Amino acid sequence: LKNIEAIKTRYLHDDLSIRLGGIAANLARVSSASSDPKDWQAVQTMLEETEFFIEWTVPDAPLNVQTFLVEVQVQLALWHRNWPALHPDVTNREKLRQWSRLVSEKTLTLMRETCATSSSGI
């Protein structure tokens, strides 16, 4: 990724709920783009970007969110590393599409739970 330090600085200005929303949005974009083999490089870039977003978010997240995000980051790293070889196969694209959609939805759920907990003072 180009200008990663500038992206990180800007990203870290957002609160946790915004960052989790950004991770969920990126995963939704991966889900949407992964079905088209012509978009494989864009998907690979989004996978890498989401790995960074998670790396920068984990230190500020509650333990349950940290655990979830680290597991997601491991899977993202595997998809990212292997995507050039995997993307031509429609089955692999479908697996990534489904996985990233489910993880996006789970991230949004965690975001809502985290916001509800922090706003209630718990």
Question: Residue ranges of each PLM-predicted region?
Answer:
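Surface-exposed peri-terminal alpha-helical interaction modules
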Residues: 1-122
